[in-house]
A protein has these predicted regions:
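Glycine-biased, low-complexity coil/linker segments
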Residues: 13-15
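Bacterial N-terminal signal peptides
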Residues: 22-33
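Short, conserved catalytic-motif segment at the N-terminal edge
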Residues: 42-107, 195-196
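Short, glycine/proline-biased beta-turn/loop segments that scaffold the active-site neighborhood
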Residues: 133-149, 239-241
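Short, surface-exposed loop or secondary-structure junction motifs
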Residues: 149-302
Length: 302
């Protein structure tokens, strides 16, 4: 990660929409507490909405809670820069003790991190001229293999193929097998697997949702910038948009700049747990996805 890669600026067409993406995510992903404090509260009718129709959303959430599909939720409806509806439902925690949901609860973004962090980071690099969407992946990761057909045909996998899930990479990786082979966590070992694993179809011929696409994009971002995706996203997305309660791990930063992973995180008590484990423990502030948690140490984009 020591070396940064610089390229000539891409075409204007490739850079279009980056600011739109950032603006969109700033609207969607700021903490609800911050939004509630900064936006004026109005009746739904004042922004052209129907209070009675909003009750359908209420009913849907209560129904999901009653059917035990979810323990709780937070709903915010914003239109024309005004808060028309904000409500917490059900419980944030149900085991080992019950805690009610609050409007400032922090949720696990899960796979939304693909678009919220990784895709935006890629487009920032496109806008800066450090990356092109039509570049082949192997330009940045030399060990990354192209697709090869049975008749000897070859086709490169491009950045855009990773972003649109048309690369041919398999959906997931064998976590237990890789943990036994490489140890845990081992992002380098995982990337070694992704670089050489069987491509399941010719790029651009099929759509297949794959966590491995975005893990590969993460490594490209880190290769270009010389930073971890966590640090790059914090400096270039989260801090800029005022997303002070958004991070890959609930941590605090020390005066020397180092990050310390700790349950003493100032906003730890606001985090909603995600999953009960076989041993009875409950994951809270840790990603529940095994690939991200076991092989990537929690800093992953899948």
């Amino acid at each position: 990660m020591e070396n940064k890669i610089n390229f000539s600026p891409p075409s204007t067409r490739e850079g279009k929409g980056v600011r739109f993406l950032l603006t969109t995510f700033s609207i969607l992903l700021c903490s609800l507490q911050a939004v509630a404090q900064s936006l004026p509260r109005v009746a739904p009718e004042q922004v052209g909405m129907d209070s009675h129709r909003l009750l359908h959303a209420d009913e849907a959430i209560h129904r999901a809670i009653d059917h035990k599909e979810i323990p709780g939720a937070v709903l915010a409806v914003i239109r024309h820069g005004k808060m028309a509806y904000l409500k917490a439902y059900g419980n944030k925690r149900i085991y080992p003790n019950v805690e009610p949901m609050e409007i400032n609860t922090v949720f696990d973004m899960a796979s939304c991190s693909k678009s919220m962090s990784t895709a935006v980071s890629v487009m920032i690099l496109v806008e800066r001229g450090q990356l092109r969407l039509l570049d082949r992946v192997s330009f940045y990761l030399p060990d990354f293999q192209e697709w090869r057909g049975e008749n000897g045909e070859k086709k490169d996998i491009r950045i855009i193929d990773l972003m649109t899930h048309t690369s041919g990479l398999p959906p997931y990786a064998p976590v237990s097998e890789l943990q036994e082979k490489y140890g845990s966590p081992n992002p380098k070992g995982l990337m070694e697997y992704i670089s050489t694993c069987k491509r399941e179809f010719k790029p651009q011929t099929k759509f297949q949702y794959s966590c491995l696409n975005y893990i590969t994009l993460q490594h490209i971002i880190e290769t270009i910038t010389g930073q971890s995706l966590r640090d790059f996203a914090k400096e270039n997305i989260f801090d800029i948009l005022g997303m002070q309660y958004t991070d890959y791990l609930p941590t605090i930063q020390q005066q020397d700049g180092k990050w310390i992973n700790t349950v003493a995180c100032p906003w730890m008590d606001r985090i909603a747990p995600t999953e009960k484990q076989k041993d009875g423990s409950v994951l809270c502030g840790q990603v529940h996805d095994p690939l991200a948690r076991i092989l990537k140490g929690g800093i992953s984009v899948n």
